[in-house]
């Protein structure tokens, strides 16, 4: 899921630079916006990822400026890989924007973002029907930290399991429950039943076990111990379960079929029985006439399912010269912006009540099931800088899939390196507290 990450180095540098800027009141801040005093026009700078959302962003800008005629919203897009570098450079020059994308709790914890609580109360925004893991603390993509909310968004992206109902029917396999989901063992077994090599049909596609396994399997409850967990019997078993699907020719390796980049394309062609991937881009599948369903990701028996959920988390820099107007924008983004994004991009509103009001599902069972799954979104165990910490896991998975090592051997080798990364991550986290 590299498309969700910002590099640890870039984020750490951002935190240092932003803290320095925030501590220098004489320098001011806020992206070079005009003062806005005495009724003068106000300029808000908003930096986002370049995601091909220009229709939505244009409509968002136009709608906000019509609602707040004294404010000029300047939207600047950057490629996701360069966003952190661009932000670092701007901060070093004292020209950081007013509105930024938020990359987890680090910025919140450092006091670099304005809390949204008062604005939410004043605007009457009801968070009770928002996707839970975004507005509750603890998750990687959560907007909450220590009883305060620091960002909000306009849509809900998630990882779910899509399945082709017609292929299930042809194989005489009952549809899986929407929630709770299949176990990984059932997932692999069904994948092999659905595989039809003669007709070019793979039973399933999934990148690796971490695409669906809860993080609690890899770390202790306090998030500070990896050894004995990441290489413990439960994770070893799950490596073996998924690897068996590869070995039996039921699941392609990611270098053959990348489920994140190609999964929906193959699924829309009827060449996949199941795929664990982003629950987005559904019109392509629907226009192809695929009779599909959706469930939460496979989860070992006895464990609470966990799946990734994200949004376009937008926060207000504490150095903004125009905090009131910037807060107004976040409010607009997460209210009217949800409607605009639904109308233009067909994305799921972050507020599930809004999704129901606009009839996002439109009577399509797969969409209705996807909304049910989202209502169960929960926070994961907190691991600072988790993607860099877990890095050696991917090497271990590669060794197992390649047949070079057993699951136990590969994970035993990876565990000390993951623990070392984890210790360093917590050391950095604690030093910034």
Identify the role of each PLM range.
Residues 2-9, 13, 21-110, 123-128, ...:
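Conserved N-terminal structural module of periplasmic/extracytoplasmic solute-binding proteins
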Residues 77-86, 180-186, 254-268:
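Short helix-initiation/N-cap motifs at beta->coil->alpha
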Residues 188-193, 227-259:
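Glycine-centered hinge/linker elements that transmit conformational signals in sensory
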Residues 98-101, 273-277:
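Paired acidic/hydrophobic, glycine-rich loop segments that form the ligand-binding mouth/hinge
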Residues 68-77, 172-178, 226-227, 244-257, ...:
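A local structural motif
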């Amino acid at each position: 899921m590299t498309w969700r990450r910002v590099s640890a180095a870039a984020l750490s540098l951002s935190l240092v630079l932003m803290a320095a800027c925030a501590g220098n009141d004489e320098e001011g801040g806020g992206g070079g916006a005009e003062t806005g005093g005495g009724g003068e026009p106000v300029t808000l700078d908003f930096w986002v990822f370049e995601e091909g959302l220009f229709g939505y962003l244009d409509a968002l800008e136009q709608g906000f400026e019509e609602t707040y005629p004294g404010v000029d919203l300047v939207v600047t897009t950057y490629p996701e890989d360069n966003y952190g570098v661009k932000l670092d450079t701007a901060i070093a020059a004292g020209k950081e924007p007013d509105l930024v994308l938020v990359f987890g709790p680090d910025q919140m914890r450092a006091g670099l973002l304005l809390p949204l609580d008062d604005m939410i109360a004043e605007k009457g925004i009801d968070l009770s029907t928002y996707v839970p893991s975004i507005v509750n603390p603890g998750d990687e993509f959560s907007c909450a930290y220590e009883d305060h909310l620091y960002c909000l968004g306009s849509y809900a992206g998630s990882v779910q399991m899509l399945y082709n109902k017609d292929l299930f029917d042809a194989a005489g396999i009952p549809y899986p429950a929407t929630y709770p989901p299949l176990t990984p063992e059932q997932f692999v077994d069904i994948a092999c039943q659905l595989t039809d090599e003669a007709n070019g049909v793979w039973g399933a596609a999934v990148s690796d076990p971490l695409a669906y396994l809860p993080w609690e399997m890899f770390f202790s409850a306090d998030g500070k111990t990896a050894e004995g967990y990441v290489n413990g019997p439960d994770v070893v078993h799950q490596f073996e379960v998924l690897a068996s699907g590869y070995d039996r020719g039921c699941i392609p390796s990611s270098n053959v079929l990348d489920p994140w980049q190609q999964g929906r394309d193959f699924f829309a062609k009827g060449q996949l029985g199941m795929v664990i991937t982003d629950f987005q881009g559904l019109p392509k599948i629907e226009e192809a006439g695929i009779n599909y369903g959706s469930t939460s990701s496979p989860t070992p028996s006895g464990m609470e399912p966990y799946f990734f959920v994200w949004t376009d988390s937008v926060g207000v820099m504490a150095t903004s010269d125009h905090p009131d107007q910037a807060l107004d924008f976040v409010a607009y983004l997460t209210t009217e912006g949800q409607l605009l994004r639904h109308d233009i991009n067909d994305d799921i509103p972050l507020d599930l009540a809004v999704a129901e009001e606009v009839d996002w599902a439109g009577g399509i069972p797969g969409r209705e099931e996807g909304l049910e799954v989202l209502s169960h979104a929960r926070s994961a165990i907190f691991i600072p800088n988790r993607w860099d910490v877990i890095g050696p896991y991917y090497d271990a998975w590669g060794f197992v899939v390649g047949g070079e090592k057993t699951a136990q051997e590969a994970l035993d080798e990876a565990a000390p390196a993951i623990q070392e990364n984890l210790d360093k991550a917590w050391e950095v986290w604690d030093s910034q507290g």
